[in-house]
Amino acid sequence: MQVNEALQATEPMPIQAGKQIASWPHLAGFLAIMGGMVAMGFLAQHGASAGSAAESQLAGHSKAIPIYLVAAFMDWALLYYCWVGVHRNGGTLETLSGGRWLTWKSVGVDLAIAAPFWAAWEGAAYGVHWLLGANSAKTVDSLLPKTLLEVLIWIGVSITAGICEEMAFRGYLQSQFRALGAGVAAAVLAQGIVFGLAHAYQGWKNTVVISVLGVLFGALAAWRKNLRSNIVVHAWADVWGGWLQHLVWR
């Protein structure tokens, strides 16, 4: 059996490339939501810092848990919006995800793909950061978890981001761009740019970095036709970047 055939055998319900999964007005609404997030991100960067934060920080640490909870709520709300549009068009959550794990073989395949992809993903992040140079934007460093409760909530928020953002951007948006007639490369690029812009609160350089990472996620989704490896890598990357790497490298 060829490698591609073996991989396809683990797919219970692959994402159907080029198929419209929600109405065009619904897509316009999604993009309007993204526009609002870009505007809020711009205001966060250029407005006064929240709480007792220094000028170089978006907010003081006392705001960490409330911000975690708001971020999780916004992610689930965005996924719910996508699901409503897909459901009205006759789809399900599997329309967005490409299906869940059904066998241990599929778990092993997806984890085997996720591990090297995460290493390449991290390398790309460091490389783009290096190319862009020093970042003068306000950072979220003061919001990183310190206490056990904050760490546990952070892990929950990371898992939420992995599930919701992958389904929203790679499952919904990338599929809709393909249905508009964009080729695979154009759809992957477009959703990656929108994904980066949704993180505009981190400043323009980080927006560029996140756009590149979003393109990589989109390429993985286009290849695998499901989001299982994407979700694993996304959630793990957030846990690693926001908490675990600071324990390992301190």
What are these regions (language model features)?
Residues 1-104, 126, 131, 242-250:
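N-terminal, membrane-interfacial amphipathic/helix-forming hydrophobic leader that caps
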Residues 12-13, 118-126, 130-250:
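Transmembrane helix-loop-helix hairpins at the membrane interface
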Residues 22-30, 63-71, 106-110, 150-154, ...:
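Residue-level signature of transmembrane alpha-helical entry/exit and packing/kink sites
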Residues 96-100, 105, 143-146, 230:
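Surface-exposed loop/turn and secondary-structure junction residues enriched for glycine/proline
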Residues 98-119:
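Interfacial segments of alpha-helical transmembrane regions
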